[in-house]
A protein has these predicted regions:
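Cysteine protease catalytic domains with a Cys-His-Asp triad
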Residues: 1-131, 135-141
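Intrinsically disordered/low-complexity terminal segments and short unstructured peptides
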Residues: 2, 150, 259-261
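Long, low-complexity, serine/threonine-rich intrinsically disordered regions
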Residues: 252-267
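Cysteine protease-like catalytic core of ubiquitin/ubiquitin-like
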Residues: 91-250, 267
Length: 269
């Protein structure tokens, strides 16, 4: 399916699972690198520059990368995409009616990472600030992190209440506003969210084999030293994209050589 941006000639940079980054040459990667839900264009990539506000698609790309390369297959961790969180939070009526459109068996996940945005309830992609909430099933708790003085606290609380029925819990959940290192400008909320996702994911994975002994209120505490700097996050994502792009080029080259060889063999028969 083409988007308006594709029709206008944006370049394909990379095709990675549920995310496409456009540049001049497309390529066929192995099955493990193919899927399409959303598109990253050059304007999206520009949000990685210092001082720029990270948009939805870059956060989705990072989540996709973690799912495919970092999280063990037997770990039941869910990364809800920003658009899905918006739908759950603001759709009218009973949230259970949305189940067919949501990831199956949400009640079975050990942890759910939930990006929060202060956007207009009636307009997607309209917010100005990101925060992050992590649901931990073992303690029925939503840990809420905000790098701008709990700017999105009410949005986080609303999202947690809307998500609760989908989790089919037998006991009430806790919403825990967690102390969070604060950003020093108005543009680093998105990269801070990525840093927090990385750290809390690491903490949860590290504790998987000793669940009965884990004090989640301790391991989910976040301090400044635990977070990557905004520059580190931006550089890491840029580097990630370049490495995947190189894999794409290598795959393209191999596919092209294979195709040429096959064609030549056919002509010689």
């Amino acid at each position: 399916m083409q988007t308006e941006a594709q029709e206008e000639g944006d370049k394909l940079v990379l095709h990675y699972h549920d995310v496409v980054i456009r540049q001049s040459v497309s390529c066929n990667l192995s099955r493990s690198l193919i899927a399409l839900i959303d598109c990253l264009n050059e304007q999206d990539l520009d949000t990685l520059a210092p001082g720029q506000w990270l948009n939805d698609t870059m956060i989705e790309f990072h989540m996709e990368f973690l799912e495919r390369t970092f999280v063990p297959k037997d770990a039941k961790y869910l990364f809800l995409r920003p658009g899905m969180v918006h739908l759950i939070t603001y759709a009218e009526g009973d949230v259970m009616q949305l189940e067919p459109a949501l990831p199956p068996q949400m009640d079975q996940y050990e942890a759910i990472f939930i990006p929060i945005n202060d956007g207009n309830p009636h307009k997607a992609y309209s917010g100005t600030h990101w925060s992050i909430m992590v649901y931990v099933r073992a303690v029925s708790s939503f840990y809420y992190y905000d790098t701008l003085k709990f700017n999105n606290l009410r949005d986080g609380e609303l999202s947690s209440k809307r998500i609760q029925p989908l989790l089919k819990l037998k006991k009430p959940t806790q919403f825990i506003p967690s102390s969070t290192p604060q950003q020093i400008n108005g543009s680093d909320c998105g990269v801070s969210v990525i840093s927090i996702i990385d750290y809390t994911l690491h903490q949860l994975l590290k504790s998987r084999d000793k669940k009965d002994q884990v004090h989640y209120d301790k391991i989910m505490i976040l301090k400044s030293k635990d977070m990557s700097t905004p520059k580190q996050v931006r550089d890491n994502i840029n580097g990630m994209i370049k490495r995947l792009q190189q894999r794409c080029k290598t795959s393209c080259s191999s596919s092209s050589s294979s195709s040429t060889t096959t064609s030549s063999s056919s002509l010689n028969k």
